[in-house]
Each structure stands twice: as C-alpha cells, then as structure tokens.
C-alpha cells in the first residue's frame, strides 16, 4: 500500500488526480493478483476496500481519467494459466461491503424498508461455481474474472461434502464457498509444520493444486448459498425457496440463516455477533439479501455487484479523537449531511481530520457535541464515521432547522430520517446539480470539473445548467480570471458545444429530475416516448400519465415525480432555454442499413458492457442491421446479449432455450458479418 495518501480527493489538481488514479488502479490490480492467484494477500480486506473505494470516488470526481479497464468496472480475477478456462453461464459478481449498522440500514431503507431479507454467514474461503447437468456434477469453476474462470473440476470432486450425483436429474448452477473448519486447519497445518497462515489461504491454494490427489489430502468442505435452475418448471419466488431446494438436493448451506423484516436487521446482527466467536469455521461477516426474487429483479445490478445485496463486515479499525468542529454539506437533492472536524488521527495508513455523522437520529443516539471524545472507524468510506461517544462534549449537536447554504427551513421526507433543503435555488444544490450534469456519464463536458463549476457559480457566471450555453458571451471577462486562460476556455467551450450533440437519452437523466434517470429514460424511449414534447403532452393528461404504469419498470413513485416535474414552471423554463440553446430534445432515430443480417431476429440486452455504453448502443446496432429490439425476454425473443450484472433475463433465456451471447461472442459475430461497430455507432 502507498504510505502517503491525501485525505480528500478534492484537494487534488487534475494532474495529481490522473497520477493518483493510475497508481491506485495498478496497486489494486497488484493486490487482486496476490489475493486471487497467489493466495498470498499482503493487506487486509478492509484496507483493500479503502483502496477500491478511493479509486471509485476519484473516478467519479475526475471521470476524464477513468479507464475502460479500471478495476472498478470488473471483479477481481483468480485466473491461472495452468488451468483450462471456462466461460461462466452466469456472471459471477462480488458484493458491496458495509462496515456498520447505520450504513447497512441506510441501504435497507433505500431498497425496501418493509421487505423480507435473508441474513446469513459470510464464509471466509474460496469462491466456487458448481455446474450440474441432469443431476451430475459437470464442472467446478473458480470465480475468475467474473465471466471466465479456471476449470478445477478434478480438484472439486475431492471436496468431501460436495454431492457428485443429485437425487433427481436436474440442471443447476450454484455459488458456493470452499473452506476448512478451524479444527481441520489446525490439524493439517500441524502436520505441515505450520507453514500456512490461515484457513482461507489454504483453501484457495488447495483447489488450485495441479494434482487432484494432493487436493484430496486436504480437509476441504463447502457451503452453497445461491443457485439458478435453468429449465426448471417451478419458478422460485424467494431466496428462501431456493435454499430449501438446495437442502433437498443434499447441498450443505450455511447454518443459522434467518429471514427477517428490514426493521429487524439491526437486532438480528447483534444476535449473529454473539455467535461469531463460537463458530467452528471462518467467517468475516454477514450477507444480507432481499428475499423476494421479483424485487431483486427490480433493483438490478451494476457491472460489479447486485444492488439487492450487501456484505456486512465485522472487522473495522477504530481510533479515539476529539471533535473540534461540526459543519454541514448540502447535496444536489437537498440532503443535508453533517460532518465533524476531529483532531488528526492515523487510521488505516491515512491521516484523518474529518468524519461523517450520517443523520440526526444517529447523532441523537450517540450524543455528539464539540469537545466530545469519540471513536472513529473506517468502515468502507473515504471519510470515516463517528461510531461511539466516550466522553460527551459541550452540547449535543443538532442539525439546524434552516439550510446552512440558503437559510431555507429544512424538511423531512416521507420514510427518510435525513433532513432536506426544499429550496431549488439553494446555492449548494444548484452547484452540485451543475456538477452532476457535466459528469462524464452524463453530458460529459470536458474542462468543467468541480472546482471550475464552483468558481463560475461563486463569481456569478452561472446560476443553472442553461447558463453554460451562454458562457461564451462572457469570454473576455473570464479570461481575466486566474485559471481561465485561452487554452482552458477553448476546451470548456468546445466541451459545452459538443454536449449539444448528445442524444436525448443522455440529456433527460442529466438534468437530474427525481425518478428520471437513465433506466427510466430508456424505458420511455423504448415505448415511443422519445421527445420532450411527447413527455410534456403526456404530463397534461392524467389518463396518459396513468398508462405509464403499464410499462414494466415504472412504478407509482415515477408517476408522481413525472407529474410534479413537468408541471413545475422552473423546470419548464429550463427545458425551453435548453431547447433555444440547440440541445437535442428528441431521441435520435435509429438508422437502417441496406445490409440486413439480423432480419427476423428479436434481441434483448441485459448487464453491462465495455464497448457499448450505454448498452442500448448494441441494440441500436441490431436494429440498424435489420433486427428488432425488445425490452423483455419471452418465447418470441430469439437472442439475448448478456454482460456482467445480468439477472432474471438471463435466467429466463436459459429456461426458454434462447441463444445467449456474451460481449466477446457478439463482437466475434459482428466481425464475421464484416460489421465495424465503431464506425456504425
């Protein structure tokens, strides 16, 4: 690990950020290699998470330096040149880690506060995927890159509690964790002169033995924790049903798994913590998952992990310090987040001077005040969090009744504990909204980073995203400002001008309206609602607004936001200004080629891709060459393009026997058809 780290990414210049991002990416790849391939990690899981999260945050702030091969876009790899490679039938993703109750419960409240969740042990072993066909073990494969793994079937057959033949001729793909009990590890390690560091390293190394006879000598076991049943007539509705089926098929599953309401998770975690030191096997936390499969499908995936699950890690690094001051931050949605300034303390190799406090309920529970002696923990955040008050301070801190940025009275939103500023003209809200609009994954305006936007706002040059398109009129005045030379301004103005050519499918979500992100925008366009004029027309008709509920993926909260957004005079004025500035307020039509190799085919897409961002670019290509794009998998679908993060669409495609392509296979297909996709899209 690097010994010298800056505490906050916003202290970096662009030049420094570029170097730090490249260095972090290399450092993470190095540790992934040591962890997954060599089975000799040099740093703890926690320290690795800090590196990963710092890179992700820096890439978000400086998106111009994010590489398509960034570790944040792919899972770690345990691929080894000594084994045959195996293309996974489903993407094998990792989980987002959380390190405290507050962080976990915040996710629960955002996901489904009243839903049912499974809580199960997170086994600290070696990840494996088992493939059974007609009831027989066909392949045992490491996680690998998430798409391709090492085929270690011969070694896996020696694991003592893996069934080689199932009691019924069923096809099933399972996720599991190969491990050793503490007792078995100690006995084996004693015979090996104590040369192994821990059960996890020994387990991971054991399944990578070149001779399966050597693996057979090692006391390996497995717990299986999830499965997909392609072609199975019974459709599982819950995770609980899947685990029950696994037990009937004689698979070992983690003990103590419970299913509880979201409101009971904190209490359940306490119960698990009481047991963790009495277990006979290694665990480094818990896994919390939504139980309802349909709700999982609605949550979806990122390229790296499912949105419907979290890993809760027990271990955390904590240090004591004294609170010096308490300040606030106001985000683009108006959410007010307090943070404390503390006396400098070294935490996980970083000098820390600030910590978050999350929300007022959390503050009240801890009793936080200036002068308080507190315990601060780094539990997966770049800025650590206050976890405990040892000695109270002067007065318990209260989030102000008025916004610290604009002095508007704060409000609480339904089902949320946080306070919000309701003023759409709040300076901090506006600045953060413009920053969001300019980000790479939004309108991608080169030259306009956080610092430039804050300067332009603070000095009166801009007050909304529409003002960006009049900025050129102030060129002479801007050239007098420090840091805005002719070269810098040329980059900014070119970036602003270039953004006018961005498709409507980027513009609408970039405006930052609640419930109108990229996913909903794509759904609207798929169903013929492809322009702002059409949207405004629907917004005036209650029946047409209600009909949007017929679109899979659009719910009541989206409908409510739709009505509120497009009846707001401020938003209508903004749209008019963007229209006058020459931005595209209608989605680009899909052109059609004379060459029609996809004619008669119906394609669906799921997951994420390196070469097609957004993923609908791949489907635009299919349509351009004669095919049809569909939003859901059905018996009429002929092909599915599936990338990392694929969910129920891939499962259904396998059940229906639909042809499935991964990204490499799709690119090979295009090559065989002599289609240069880069020139086409």
UniProtKB/Swiss-Prot annotation:
It holds the Pfam family HHH_5. Keywords: DNA damage, DNA repair, DNA replication, Ligase, Magnesium, Manganese, Metal-binding, NAD, Zinc. Residues 593-681 form the BRCT domain. Its cofactor is Mg(2+); Mn(2+). The keyword ATP-binding does not apply. Signal peptide: none annotated. It is an enzyme of class 6 (ligase). Its EC number is 6.5.1.2. The active site is at residue 122. The keyword Iron does not apply. Disulfide bonds: none annotated. GO terms for biological process: DNA repair; DNA replication. NAD(+) binds at residues 45-49, 94-95, 120, 143, 177, 289, 313. DNA ligase that catalyzes the formation of phosphodiester linkages between 5'-phosphoryl and 3'-hydroxyl groups in double-stranded DNA using NAD as a coenzyme and as the energy source for the reaction. It is essential for DNA replication and repair of damaged DNA. HAMAP family: DNA_ligase_A. This is DNA ligase. It comes from Leptospira borgpetersenii serovar Hardjo-bovis (strain JB197). The lineage of its organism: Bacteria, Pseudomonadati, Spirochaetota, Spirochaetia, Leptospirales. The gene is ligA.
